[in-house]
Amino acid sequence: MQKKSKQIINNENLPLYLFHQGTNYNSYEYMGAHFCAKNGENCVVFRVWAPNADSVSVVGDFNGWDKTKTVMKRISINGVFEAEVFGLNEYDVYKYAVTNNGKTVLKADPYAFHAETPPGTASKLYKIDGYIWNDQDFIYNKTTPYDKPVNVYEVNLGSWKKHKDGSYYTYRELADKLLDYVIKLGYTHIEIMPICEFPFDGSWGYQCVSYFAISSRFGTPKDFMYFIDVAHQKGLSVILDWVPSHFPKDEHGLYEFDGTCCYEYKDEFKKEHKEWGTRVFDWGKCEVQSFLISSAMFLLEKFHLDGLRVDAVSSMLYLDYGRKDGEWLPNSNGENLNLEAIAFLKKLNEVIFARFPNALMVAEESTSYPMVTKPTDKGGLGFNFKWNMGWMNDVLSYVECDPYFRSKTHDKLTFSLFYAFNENFILPISHDEVVHGKKSLIDKMPGDIYNKFSQIRAFNAYMFSHPGKKLNFMGNEYGQFREWDYKNGLEFFMLKFPMHKKLLNYNITLNNIYKNTPSLYEIEDSWEGFKWISPDERDNNVISYYRTDTNGNSIYVIINFSGNDYIDYRLGLEKGTYKLILNSNAKKYGGSGQVKGKTFRTIRKSAHGNKNSIKFNLPKFTALYFIKTQN
């Protein structure tokens, strides 16, 4: 057995062997379509996995889409087929004609590097190598930002802006327009909603069919490389949404690829998310592991992405996710956990961090599943960040409540601190919160226009001073009232109105305060970085606290979420002089200007358990940040 194993390892078919073992993490270099030279001629080698197919052919314009002309040869007993075709050119279109039990279906190449723009469904030949990068300094200096500012601008490339004729901005146009805008606003990261090729615009990219082909709606793969290259040169990190949880049932895609359940589970209790109308990957299958992990590695390697946000992790973890009683079966331990998915996620993160130690692997996980961001050798899933969905649901529920009744829901403001240090959290106000009748962020705020703007300013100050990294969806920055609509660009014309322009300026100020104030981001994992001043003023709808950095410097925060003005409010602080560095009530931001003064000296009058305090007016829906300038 040892001799046979050695022969296999030394064989030229090592990539094929590893692919079937679930350990070929660069399988895109072997599978798919690759240009090469044979006997002095240009040749393309095609390889595809279709284990239960009776036959597979390569078809395209080059052979009149005739499945009898370029029949592929089975080169492994586990179902990899291969063919060599001469005389093809880059951008030529092709598919695989996969036949099972007399039925032939034309399939896009799962490993294609490029694809036709929908509604076209064919794959395109593409030379993925050759882009000359200019981001070496950025890559060299990259670190994992546990103690650094992370402020993410989440964007849908197809609907940030559109041309007057309704056409998309290209990757190269977005590199000029979008990136400069994001930099101007003071963000540190940009997160792009999924752009692995997807057929249905209404899926927002979350139902993709080509895990190695960046959407051609916006240009070529090298155009996207240019986008990321420019982002890095401007100091901006790029995260991409990635969906290893499920895929759509489009006939040309992964769905029953070889005429049977190939990439998806065969088990009727596992194979489909009926709520979404999609198929579920079989993460226990070795070839699926090679496929998905290779996709993640490909995106990080070839495009220099700084991280992946893994979508719908909860749907992977639980066998009963979205399923009623009788629609799922427990695992071998009698639990509702999908052990294969858990093992896959751990393996994914181990492989990623072995090659890209400073990558961001962000889990969108909406339950209280433990240790999502703990290392796998300590029993965790191995991600390094997780969206804090509990915080998001609680605080949005709180701010949507009429201020008169907020005292009854005060715990929603404070409960998150009971678990804030259990994981490495990102606080997400994402696209999911501004669609489907949920209203835009500013329109969630009760009251008239003036009060809506006042409350969103206070809310943002709360978010940026709460432990956890930050994420906001496009349009939140200037208070778009219309819900996000993937068919249309953002309403930037709203910036002609003073209140929207002032809100944008306020958020720029807030972003820059966050980015330049270590106490707001250095210590996110313990009480050393956060202390309450007064968590329980529920009758007043007021909270106060301070954040501290590793050098002992602090920023002091007080927020009034009530509709009442508090005159001569006292905030208990240590003896000293304090400077007001953020006032959400300032006239320049659209407020009433009721907070007078910029410097405040404590007097010997107790408040909040301190012997000393400062005094100021605290108007309704107002947030204030102070720093200590003198003892």
Question: Where does each model-flagged region fall?
Answer:
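The feature marks proteins involved in alpha-glucan
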Residues: 1-45, 75-154, 159-166, 173, ...
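C-terminal beta-strand-rich structural cap/linker in extracellular carbohydrate-active enzymes
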Residues: 90-94, 597-631
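Substrate-binding/active-site clefts of carbohydrate-active enzymes
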Residues: 116, 137-149, 156-337, 600
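Conserved alpha/beta catalytic core and glycan-binding cleft of carbohydrate-active enzymes
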Residues: 118-119, 304-306, 324-489, 494, ...
